[in-house]
Structure formats: structure tokens, C-alpha cells
Amino acid sequence: DVVGALPKALYKGDYDVRVILPNYTCIPWEYRGKFRYLNHFYMDYGQRSENMFVGIMQYEYEGITFYFIDNEYYFKCDKPYTDSIRWDIERYIFFCKAVLAAMPVIGFHPDIIHCHDWQTGMIPVFLRSTFASHSFYWGTKSIMTIHNLKFQGVWDIKHFLYNTNLPRYMFTPDKLEFKKDANMLKGGLVYADYITTVSETYAEEIKTPYYGEQLDGLLCARSRSLRGILNGIDYTVYNPETDPKISVHYTVKDAVEKKKEAKRALQRNWD
């Protein structure tokens, strides 16, 4: 919802907002069938001897340009996430590096790369390490947004070393190491220029041991770069006056009674 609605809101403010996603084969064909091929290249990935294919597909939707990183080995799937966190970590490390490698090919130099949750956590890491010497990326900043702190992308350091080809000194407690393993979200929180989360209240809560999911110390250390921004919704989609997915429409004037009717209709559908 956020990646769908936020770009539309920013676009109205005359910002050039673009979105990059994996080209999951489980994306409905009504959309995938309209993707157009833009370009492709081969990218070194981790400590492998052969380079990996990276395709770039493009799609325009409601004024926003979407790019899709294509690689069937990683993104041919029935659902975005699998039952293997080890495999998903390998897939998303690939995605993170491919996103940065694709930008010069696309010809788009963003001022800010906005990353969401652990699946994109390696983008700020790569931006400040592997890609730091490339002049194309100079001046580009990164923001890491936490939607759900519980999920962090944690696996053993050896797996991360093989798939990132980063130096061993980056896997220390002040960087990517987390209880002798490696942590993708932690990497993003350490290396991002700024951190946001879904509300001001949650931004304060995650700095405490109870809500901090063992990252509260890091979040306290970065508190000057941490801000809560309340989630909004797209009123053109979630509008009870016009939403075709609810049985009873209502406005603020009759919401109390009509919402009860809508709830009863929903319950009848599940009887």
C-alpha cells in the first residue's frame, strides 16, 4: 500500500518519483502483460565465478514509472516470499545490488533512494561501500523505513560474505553483525542517511527493549536521524462512498449505521 500510494502523492507535488521492484512472475498478468523490455546487463554477484543476468522491465501506472528487476532464477515464484529465509536473503541481496547497478543503465540519478524493510536493507550498505567510489552515486542519499521491525533478514555471516563479497570487517557488532549472525535490516539502519517509521509513537516505542526487537540500542544511537511519519491512505482507492468492494456505501453523516450494515453483509458472506 505504501509503495503504491506514496509515489502518487509525491508525484502530485511535482517530484520525479520512480519505483523499482522485483519482476515476480506471480504479479497478475493484467499488469505483467503490459511491462515492456527496457534493457539488460550482466552483474557480478558475490563470490560467484560467473556474472548474473539482470533484466529491466518498465511499466507506467497512474503517472508513475515502475521498473522491475528481472531474473527468473530468483523471481520465478508463486508468491513474493518463500518458506526459506536463507533463500529469500540471497534473492534480496541480489535485488539490492541490481537496483543500484541498474540506475546508470536506466539513466536515472535519484537524490534519495527510499528503502522499505529488511528486503531492501542492503541498498544503503552497498551505496556506502561497493558503489561508493562510482561518481554516478555521489550525492545520492538513502532513507530506511521500518514498517515491521520484527522481520529483519537474519542468517549466518558466511552466507552474507558469499553473496555480498563485502569485507569481513563490515560484519562487526557496530555494523552488520547481530548475535554472531548477519542482519540485513540492521545493515540498512546503520548505513542509511535517515530512518523513518510509520508513526511518531512507534518511533519512540522501538527505542525501548520491549518494542525494539533487540535493535533498540542502535535506534537510540541513531535517534537524531530517526523520525516517525504517520501512514496515510489513498482516498481514491479506500473511499467508503465509492468503494466497489464493500456492500454498503456511507459518508461521515451516516457512517455509524451504515458501517454496521456493511459489517453484517461481510459476515453473511463468510457464513
Predicted regions and their residues:
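Catalytic cores of nucleotide-sugar-dependent glycosyltransferases that transfer UDP/GDP/TDP-activated
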Residues: 1-271
